[in-house]
């Protein structure tokens, strides 16, 4: 047993403060993304999640420019992006995609401008890499309270909205008949989504945060038979792949001394592998069920 622990955990892992911070912030972000992600997939708003993550990158870039907490920048722009989607408004799925694309383009334009100023006007030459791909081991411990507060806020919002959000995600027309204010619930979900992508962007970067939002949720919905179980499983998978990615990234410093691999790479790779495995398992389960039905 001790041999396995020594093999998996390189020296100093449990005593490293950057690792502690990464585990706390990354785990919290993954938990929130896993919960919110299930409803995002069920509502067919994966593109909106991707768009808000990219829009939030403008806030991350601006935060480096003016010297504030990057998470605040991500949050402000993600919330503004959600507000923009709701303000322009659209009822049909195709129109929602058009609105999302417009907001995405505007956000990326601002991100390009702010990153240009970061590189040319300040000394933050690594801002683009940090904003787009994350730097989990560089997250300061002082960010933990704000990250946890944002995560708790998003989880409380989902808990309060759970039943109407679930009903409106499965059948919007039935939800409206039963008195659910579908558009209000949809906007509140967008706000929770903005909080989730902001947290994931600060950990694995704006570009790759969609994998942490959509991947665990898609896997869970393939495996679980009930929405409640899917939410719990998605959160568990998200935390598992994030902590696993942190461990592998830390160990990678010993594979190629002085040149570790990014956490985001391992997180996305683990999500992809689990998604492929879940698809294979689902196909095998369907074949077995069809065979049993034929024999009956």
Where are these regions (language model features)?
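Transmembrane helix-bundle core of multi-pass membrane transporters
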Residues: 6-12, 17, 103-161
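Hydrophobic alpha-helical transmembrane segments
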Residues: 23-28, 71-76, 98-102, 144-149, ...
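Hydrophobic alpha-helical segments embedded in the membrane of multi-pass proteins
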Residues: 31, 35, 53-57, 79, ...
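Helix-loop-helix "hairpin" substructures at the membrane interface of multi-pass membrane proteins
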Residues: 29, 143-216
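Cytosolic-side transmembrane-helix boundaries in multi-pass membrane proteins
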Residues: 252, 259-296
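Short loop segments and helix-boundary regions at transmembrane helix junctions
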Residues: 38-122, 220-235, 248, 252-256, ...
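Hydrophobic core segments of alpha-helical transmembrane domains in multi-pass membrane transport
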Residues: 26-34, 60, 82-83, 108-112, ...
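Membrane-interfacial amphipathic/re-entrant helices at transmembrane-helix boundaries
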Residues: 1-30
């Amino acid at each position: 047993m001790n041999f396995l622990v020594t093999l998996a955990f390189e020296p100093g892992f449990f005593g490293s403060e950057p690792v502690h911070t990464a585990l706390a912030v990354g785990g919290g972000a993954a938990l929130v993304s896993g919960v919110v992600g299930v409803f995002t997939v069920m509502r067919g708003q994966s593109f909106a999640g991707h768009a808000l993550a990219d829009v939030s990158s403008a806030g991350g870039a601006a935060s480096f420019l003016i010297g504030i907490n990057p998470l605040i920048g991500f949050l402000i722009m993600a919330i503004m992006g959600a507000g923009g989607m709701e303000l322009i408004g659209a009822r049909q799925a195709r129109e929602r995609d058009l609105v999302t694309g417009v907001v995405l383009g505007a956000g990326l334009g601002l991100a390009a401008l702010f990153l240009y100023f970061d590189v040319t006007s300040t000394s933050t030459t690594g801002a683009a890499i940090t904003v787009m791909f994350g730097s989990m081991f560089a997250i300061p411990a002082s960010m933990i309270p704000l990250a946890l507060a944002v995560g708790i806020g998003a989880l409380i919002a989902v808990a309060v909205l759970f039943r109407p959000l679930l009903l409106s995600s499965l059948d919007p027309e039935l939800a409206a008949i039963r008195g659910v204010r579908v558009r209000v619930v949809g906007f509140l979900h967008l706000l929770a989504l903005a909080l989730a992508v902001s947290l994931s962007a600060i950990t694995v970067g704006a570009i790759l945060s969609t994998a942490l939002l959509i991947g665990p949720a898609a896997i869970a919905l393939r495996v679980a038979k009930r929405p409640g179980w899917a939410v719990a499983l998605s959160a568990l998978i998200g935390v598992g792949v994030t902590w696993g990615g942190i461990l592998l990234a830390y160990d990678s410093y010993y594979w190629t001394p002085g040149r570790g691999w990014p956490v985001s790479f391992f997180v996305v790779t683990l999500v992809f592998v689990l998604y492929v495995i879940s698809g294979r398992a689902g196909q095998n389960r369907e074949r077995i069920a069809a065979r049993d039905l034929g024999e009956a």
